Amino acid sequence: ALSRVVGLFSARGYNIETLTVAPTEDATLSRMTIVTTGSDDVIEQITKHLNRLIEVVKVVDLTEGANIDSVFMLIKVRGVSKEREEMKRTADIFRGCISDVTEKSYTIELTGNKGKLDAFIDSIERTAILETVRTGGSGIGRGERILKV
């Protein structure tokens, strides 16, 4: 199913900003969370094309209702002398977890929506960033809104 979905996006010239695939509570199904952009008409076309794929069981646009979305990021930052305490304090403010410490760096784990992670990056000096990696977004409807097949 993954190759068919990616092939559809590629063939039609649609852009995938992020893509996350993981098992669900049903061992026979995986859940794909795709983040893409486009006008309402483009999103409608993407949804129609996805629904036509045999491997696709259901398509839900999470932006059509209340939802929770989250991204995971690991960021390695320089941490020497006075920078160390500042990095630790900034990580604490954003509820990050320091998962690795060396004499010259910290690796910080952060989760949250894209805006929160971007705000963290904006709050530290760009020259302090040594390396960054992010997952694609994952999302789920709020409250009683569930994806059931």
Model-derived regions: residue spans:
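Long, contiguous binding/interaction regions
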Residues: 1-30, 35-149
